[in-house]
């Protein structure tokens, strides 16, 4: 069977789908499902560990050199000593090569997979992050190319693992798990040594999402973290904090600014609700309640880990994706919400007075891993968690009464699924599909 797609992303025109599975990135033409771009990350999963080994060797070599110089100086100062003693310091001591550290029992596994993907504003570049060597990757995208439409132009390694990216047309903004945010150019310039990179802003907690936003022709960086904070920083003077948005009680995993109104922000994470903000004005407009709607779709997976499980424990909600669009038919505005590892999509109508009402709960046969939206025709492409070799995607289109319906694209879906080159024998060979809930802080934190 095929390994499910982990990330799906579509261009604004809705003509091409970007999808990742493990360390493989593919671009599909949606008119026929044909592969027009492909890239495989061949970096060794143990590259960071090998770097540690190399650094230790350099330290040992420097220590050995300093010891030899010290001994030689002592011998020169002791001219009365026998010649054989003078030559003692000339014998080079062998360096004991440190072993490559191997994660012990219980250590988190090292995966070689693409952690995040995003298109630049002009869609001329595709950016992502890798888990193997803690790097940001930047591709030039040429959809008119008759060959591979993807060309890797930069791979910038970071000291800490990057977990989220955003960009404008010139700059890639990268957030890492240490709480720092970096800015690197979207260009062909060679990457710099990771130790020379300086963060442009930082949180005291692990970052979970980042956005580049514009308001009144001024740029800002919005960051969400594990400690339920949302920070609004000026950019490029990102040390200047515009606002802190306080409304969440659990981690913030998803920040979304609608294209139809850049003054709004929808945020979600580990709470039972979403927050709707006027982010520039630091105004919380409303909280969108989710628990009653999602409760029928929460399963054993959504319970806390066994060591934290009590009689009072509730099944937990973790927001995987937030999207917004305007219906071409009714011109009404909608919010689409995906909760992690659930067989449903929630749709809410956003009214002119910024009140929000539930519109639809779309039930699916399989858990949804990720979704993306084609704005041109208000349709959704979903990557589904299915043990099959036939259909790893589903298409939903907006029908009458602005209700999503399953659309028949059997041939295209099968063509795309067949092009997925990641075959596995059993489910346990799947890479992480659901990890957002691990951001939730427990009593041990």
Curated annotation (Swiss-Prot):
Signal sequence region: none
GO function terms (MF aspect): enzyme activator activity
InterPro entries linked: Trm82, WD40/YVTN_repeat-like_dom_sf, WD40_repeat_dom_sf, WD40_rpt
Gene3D superfamilies (UniProt xref): YVTN repeat-like/Quinoprotein amine dehydrogenase (2.130.10.10)
Region Disordered: start-end pairs: 60-103
Biochemical pathway: tRNA modification; N(7)-methylguanine-tRNA biosynthesis
Compartments, as annotated in UniProt: Nucleus
Disulphide-bonded residues: none
Biological process, per Gene Ontology: tRNA (guanine-N7)-methylation
Intervals holding WD repeats: 109-149, 205-243, 247-289
SMART domains the UniProt entry points to: WD40
PROSITE patterns reported in the protein's UniProt record: WD_REPEATS_REGION
GO cellular component assignments: cytosol; nucleus; tRNA (m7G46) methyltransferase complex
Biased composition (Basic and acidic residues): 60-94
Keywords noted in UniProt: Nucleus, Repeat, tRNA processing, WD repeat
Self-association and partners: Forms a heterodimer with the catalytic subunit TRM8.
Family label: Belongs to the WD repeat TRM82 family.
Role according to the record: Required for the formation of N(7)-methylguanine at position 46 (m7G46) in tRNA. In the complex, it is required to stabilize and induce conformational changes of the catalytic subunit.
Protein name as it appears in the record: tRNA (guanine-N(7)-)-methyltransferase non-catalytic subunit TRM82
């Amino acid at each position: 069977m095929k390994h499910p797609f982990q990330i799906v992303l579509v261009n604004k025109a809705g003509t091409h789908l970007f999808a990742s599975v493990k360390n493989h990135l593919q671009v599909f033409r949606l008119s026929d499902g044909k592969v027009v771009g492909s890239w495989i990350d061949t970096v060794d999963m143990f590259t960071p560990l090998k770097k540690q080994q190399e650094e230790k060797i350099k330290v040992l070599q420097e220590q050995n050199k300093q010891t030899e110089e010290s001994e030689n100086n002592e011998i020169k100062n002791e001219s009365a000593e026998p010649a054989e003693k003078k030559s003692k310091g000339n014998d080079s001591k062998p360096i004991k090569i440190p072993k490559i550290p191997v994660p012990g029992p219980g250590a988190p596994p090292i995966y070689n997979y693409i952690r995040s993907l995003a298109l630049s504003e002009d869609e001329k570049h595709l950016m992502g992050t890798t888990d193997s060597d803690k790097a940001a990757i930047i591709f030039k995208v040429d959809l008119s190319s008759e060959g591979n439409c993807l060309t890797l132009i930069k791979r910038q390694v970071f000291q800490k693992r990057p977990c989220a990216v955003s960009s404008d047309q010139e700059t890639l903004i990268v957030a890492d798990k240490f709480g720092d945010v970096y800015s690197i150019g979207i260009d062909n310039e060679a990457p710099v040594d990771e130790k020379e990179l300086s963060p442009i802003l930082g949180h005291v907690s692990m970052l979970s999402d980042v956005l580049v936003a514009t308001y009144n022709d001024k740029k800002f960086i919005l960051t969400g973290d594990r400690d339920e904070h949302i920070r609004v920083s000026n950019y490029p003077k990102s040390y200047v904090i515009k606002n802190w948005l306080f409304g969440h009680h659990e981690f913030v995993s998803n920040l979304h600014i609608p294209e139809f109104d850049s003054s709004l922000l929808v945020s979600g994470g580990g709470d039972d609700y979403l927050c709707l903000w006027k982010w520039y004005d630091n105004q919380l407009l409303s909280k969108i309640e989710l628990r009653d709607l999602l409760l029928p779709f929460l399963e054993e997976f959504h319970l806390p880990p066994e060591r934290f499980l009590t009689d009072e424990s509730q099944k937990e909600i973790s927001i995987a994706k937030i999207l917004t669009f305007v219906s071409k038919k009714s011109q009404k505005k909608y919010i689409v919400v995906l909760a992690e590892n659930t067989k449903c999509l929630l749709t809410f109508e956003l009214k002119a007075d910024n009140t929000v009402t539930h519109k639809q709960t779309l039930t699916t046969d399989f858990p949804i891993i990720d979704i993306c939206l084609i704005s041109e025709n208000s349709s959704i492409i979903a990557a589904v968690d299915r043990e099959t070799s036939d259909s790893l995607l589903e298409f939903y289109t907006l029908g009458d009464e602005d209700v999503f319906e399953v659309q028949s694209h059997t041939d295209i879906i099968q063509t795309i699924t067949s092009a997925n080159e990641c075959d596995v024998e059993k489910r346990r060979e799947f890479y992480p599909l659901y990890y957002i809930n691990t951001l939730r802080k427990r009593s041990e934190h």
